[in-house]
């Protein structure tokens, strides 16, 4: 049965497995960005209460000149940097590891400190100290202030829109010594104010009918096309128009979605469907 999940800043929908009683395979080593990793990272970012992000926030891109020989060495550098940031007063952090075309990793992160002092140099100096063995230099580091709600959404728009096929997350750009084992590719630390997800069941007049789910998908697509058209971005518009396109009828019924849609718009979708006679219930 299709299930829709609504977050503070987006939502997803899909067909849940009919039977999930099978014995699950134990989780193995992380091998780069996967659809699941992208989905979990996006779900977290969609849930953040941006109005409660207290403290002084910074968006950072931290790089190295030379690729660490192993993923373990990269994780060691990242953890050492985080430890220095905690001692400096860090209250929360979100980070992702991505790769340049030349196969060298870099770190994108959003970090907050208690108080109101925005100290980019503190973060950069700590990175240069822990990553000196990989040729980290001052010119390769970038930082800017996360100025309230607008600054947070600017960070999210960049790092939540990338899928597993983006060149900075593509497995083809993994360093040779990292293939088969990369370690975690995203993470968070400290206190993050988040909203609970809301699960919604939509049905039509038939018993356990899926018509409500299909109607909701069409509303999401229509909103996405309208939003892309108003932005003037031709690439976004082409992508939005291709949403749900599939020549295989049986497969098209199972196509899911995960889109950044304002909460009030998603609730308006539900009200629209309820007014049209669909059953709308929350779990």
Swiss-Prot record:
According to the lineage, what is the superkingdom? Bacteria
Any GO BP: DNA replication
Q: Which InterPro entries match?
A: ORF2/G2P_dom
Q: Keywords, A to Z?
A: DNA replication, Plasmid
The protein's name: Putative replication protein XF_b0001
